Amino acid sequence: MRIGYGYDVHGLVPGRKLVLGGVTIPYDRGLAGHSDADVLLHALADALLGAAALGDIGHYFPPGDPRYKDADSMLLLREVYRHVQTAGYRLANADATITAQEPRLAPYIDAMRERIAAALGVTKEQISVKATTTEGLGFTGRGEGISAQAVVLLLDREAGAGL
């Protein structure tokens, strides 16, 4: 068993789509970044890599590399999980929290869980996504950006289905 933690943050800017957990969310701004800047998937990717001691997302997808300009982070997450599986692990479960003052994310959480589960080839019950605010405090509270944190539990791939 191995545990990993990931964190990501991006600023909100006009003229970009807001993509979280692979779901496009209607909003007047989106997240700044080289790829689609999906903070939830980036935090999840870092948690997966960390649990397997495989480095971080920037090692695999350097922010200045033109191949990843506006890249779909769901594809990056799938690639990360292939590395994790090659290292001999499989996902037991993931738990993630998005911190954003706006927009309201509750209506999109189920779709995020479904997209992430499908990308990783696991059940929706293995993926938890929550959203919270900072009650107006800090950069997320002022609406300057969105952050996400994720924790994963990996099991040896050869281990039985139960924990």
UniProtKB/Swiss-Prot annotation:
<dbReference type="InterPro" id="IPR020555">
    <property type="entry name" value="MECDP_synthase_CS"/>
</dbReference>
<feature type="binding site">
    <location>
        <position position="10"/>
    </location>
    <ligand>
        <name>a divalent metal cation</name>
    </ligand>
</feature>
<dbReference type="InterPro" id="IPR003526">
    <property type="entry name" value="MECDP_synthase"/>
</dbReference>
<protein>
    <recommendedName>
        <fullName>2-C-methyl-D-erythritol 2,4-cyclodiphosphate synthase</fullName>
        <ecNumber>4.6.1.12</ecNumber>
    </recommendedName>
</protein>
<feature type="site" description="Transition state stabilizer">
    <location>
        <position position="34"/>
    </location>
</feature>
<keyword id="KW-0479">Metal-binding</keyword>
<comment type="similarity">
    <text>Belongs to the IspF family.</text>
</comment>
<feature type="binding site">
    <location>
        <position position="139"/>
    </location>
    <ligand>
        <name>4-CDP-2-C-methyl-D-erythritol 2-phosphate</name>
    </ligand>
</feature>
<feature type="binding site">
    <location>
        <begin position="56"/>
        <end position="58"/>
    </location>
    <ligand>
        <name>4-CDP-2-C-methyl-D-erythritol 2-phosphate</name>
    </ligand>
</feature>
<feature type="binding site">
    <location>
        <position position="142"/>
    </location>
    <ligand>
        <name>4-CDP-2-C-methyl-D-erythritol 2-phosphate</name>
    </ligand>
</feature>
<dbReference type="GO" id="GO:0019288">
    <property type="term" value="P:isopentenyl diphosphate biosynthetic process, methylerythritol 4-phosphate pathway"/>
</dbReference>
<comment type="subunit">
    <text>Homotrimer.</text>
</comment>
<feature type="binding site">
    <location>
        <begin position="132"/>
        <end position="135"/>
    </location>
    <ligand>
        <name>4-CDP-2-C-methyl-D-erythritol 2-phosphate</name>
    </ligand>
</feature>
<feature type="site" description="Transition state stabilizer">
    <location>
        <position position="133"/>
    </location>
</feature>
<feature type="binding site">
    <location>
        <begin position="8"/>
        <end position="10"/>
    </location>
    <ligand>
        <name>4-CDP-2-C-methyl-D-erythritol 2-phosphate</name>
    </ligand>
</feature>
<keyword id="KW-0414">Isoprene biosynthesis</keyword>
<feature type="binding site">
    <location>
        <position position="42"/>
    </location>
    <ligand>
        <name>a divalent metal cation</name>
    </ligand>
</feature>
<feature type="binding site">
    <location>
        <position position="8"/>
    </location>
    <ligand>
        <name>a divalent metal cation</name>
    </ligand>
</feature>
<dbReference type="GO" id="GO:0016114">
    <property type="term" value="P:terpenoid biosynthetic process"/>
</dbReference>
<dbReference type="GO" id="GO:0008685">
    <property type="term" value="F:2-C-methyl-D-erythritol 2,4-cyclodiphosphate synthase activity"/>
</dbReference>
<comment type="pathway">
    <text>Isoprenoid biosynthesis; isopentenyl diphosphate biosynthesis via DXP pathway; isopentenyl diphosphate from 1-deoxy-D-xylulose 5-phosphate: step 4/6.</text>
</comment>
<dbReference type="GO" id="GO:0046872">
    <property type="term" value="F:metal ion binding"/>
</dbReference>
<dbReference type="Pfam" id="PF02542">
    <property type="entry name" value="YgbB"/>
</dbReference>
<feature type="binding site">
    <location>
        <begin position="34"/>
        <end position="35"/>
    </location>
    <ligand>
        <name>4-CDP-2-C-methyl-D-erythritol 2-phosphate</name>
    </ligand>
</feature>
<comment type="function">
    <text>Involved in the biosynthesis of isopentenyl diphosphate (IPP) and dimethylallyl diphosphate (DMAPP), two major building blocks of isoprenoid compounds. Catalyzes the conversion of 4-diphosphocytidyl-2-C-methyl-D-erythritol 2-phosphate (CDP-ME2P) to 2-C-methyl-D-erythritol 2,4-cyclodiphosphate (ME-CPP) with a corresponding release of cytidine 5-monophosphate (CMP).</text>
</comment>
<dbReference type="InterPro" id="IPR036571">
    <property type="entry name" value="MECDP_synthase_sf"/>
</dbReference>
<keyword id="KW-0456">Lyase</keyword>
